[in-house]
A protein has these predicted regions:
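Glycosyltransferase donor-binding loop in the core domain
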Residues: 72, 81, 96, 108, ...
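Short, flexible, glycine-rich and Lys/Arg-enriched loop motifs at helix boundaries
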Residues: 34-38, 188-209, 219-240
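Alpha-helical structural signal
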Residues: 13, 17, 98, 116, ...
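Generic anion/oxyanion-binding catalytic loop in active/binding sites
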Residues: 66, 78, 90, 97, ...
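A structural signal for well-ordered alpha-helical scaffolds and beta->alpha junctions
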Residues: 48-52, 164, 206-210, 245, ...
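N-terminal Rossmann-like NAD(P)+-binding domain of SDR-like oxidoreductases, especially those catalyzing
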Residues: 1-193
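Short-chain dehydrogenase/reductase
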Residues: 109, 157-165, 199, 203-211, ...
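C-terminal substrate-binding subdomain of Rossmann-fold SDR/epimerase-dehydratase oxidoreductases
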Residues: 212-342
Length: 342
């Protein structure tokens, strides 16, 4: 019996694959490599080499198979599930850039909803009855209050958030109609890296604050742009709840265990309950690196709420989940180690 992991070459997906293998699971990765340096349009050769090495390390793990392909290819998905006796799917694949979703909403609805719906139908036809979905705190939009509980109103500010929310509705309906057991894990801000330094965050193009800040401080990237300094927060910059990618991987295994015991979970927040502003993160990054982060101000990005901080109590109560590496300094130190290693 195996797990189908879509997007298993990506940042969160690859960390999950490693955790799953260490827990004794067999994994089939389905990934089109579009988010990797190799699949990017304009990635530096050093990025391609570092990421290629990271992918090779994942594929060298026992019990891991990579199938390069599209999640919307129903025949391929169904064949993979039947051939490898897949019992559950972890769905990480998708478009994640908020700004891009505002410019190209059709792309996000195509990948994050339409193709994901084809994927869901294909695995269901192959007899797969459990789905853990990589959702997002962006489904909440601008919250009425923080921290944000799962019961909060969902009015996403971006097509990215709307496309993710749409697939949550599809999973909810699939449970009613077909008995699918599911969890939609609403990440707040995934960050950090495996503490051994061999796996790092790498999006192409990179849009996440922590890798951009560290690369700027290390002289590996341009000065960091602070998008908006007039938000209704203590220092005028956006506030986010950062959770370590290894903690996210552990939470997925806990959620999978619940589904395998016949307990559907629905939506669950994955965060720490503590928010940090952009300026606070930059100050902490400078302290960890030992040099300032070159930076400048830029206009707000469309679709960015002022604050996103999790009420993480439901995951603690229902999964027994408690982050262990999500202290901001630990998270930054792990991320820095991976960027120096790479």
């Amino acid at each position: 019996m195996s797990l189908l992991v879509t997007g298993g070459v990506g940042f969160v997906g690859s960390h999950f694959v490693r955790a799953a293998v260490e827990a004794g699971r067999r994994v089939i990765i389905l990934d089109d490599l579009s988010g990797s340096a190799a699949g990017g349009a304009a990635a530096a050769q050093s990025d391609c080499q570092a990421e290629g090495a990271a992918i090779a390390r994942i594929l060298a793990l026992p019990g891991v198979t990579l199938q390069v392909g599209d999640i919307g290819d129903s025949a391929l998905v169904e064949s993979l599930c039947r051939t490898h006796h897949v019992t559950a799917m972890l769905h990480f694949a998708g478009k994640i850039q908020v700004g891009e979703s505002v410019r190209r909403p059709e792309l996000h609805f195509d990948v994050n909803f339409a193709r994901a719906l084809s994927l869901l139908e294909a695995v269901r036809h192959a007899g797969v009855g459990q789905v853990v979905f990589s959702s997002t705190a962006a489904v909440y939009g601008t919250p009425d209050q923080v921290p944000i509980a799962e019961s909060a109103r969902c009015e996403p500010d971006s097509p990215y958030g709307r496309s993710k929310r749409a697939f949550e509705w599809a999973l909810m309906s699939a449970e009613v109609a077909h008995g699918i057991k599911w969890a939609a894990l609403r990440y707040f801000n995934a960050a950090g890296a495996h503490p051994d330094g061999t796996m790092r965050e790498a999006h192409h193009p990179e849009t996440h604050l922590i890798p951009l800040a560290l690369d700027a401080a290390l002289g590996k990237g341009p000065p960091l742009s602070i998008f908006g300094s007039d938000y209704p927060t203590a220092d005028g910059t956006c506030v986010r709840d950062y959770i370590h990618v290894c903690d996210l991987a552990a939470a997925h295994l806990l959620a999978l265990r619940e589904l395998e015991h016949g307990r559907s979970l629905g939506p669950l927040n994955l965060g720490t309950g503590t928010g940090y502003s952009v300026r606070q993160v930059l100050d902490a990054a400078a302290d960890v690196v030992g040099r300032p982060v070159p930076q400048g101000l830029a206009p707000r990005r469309a679709g960015d709420p002022a604050q996103l901080v999790a009420d993480a109590s439901a995951a603690r109560q229902r999964l027994g989940f408690a982050p262990v590496r999500s202290d901001l300094r630990v998270l930054l130190e792990d991320a820095l180690r991976s960027r120096r290693h790479g």
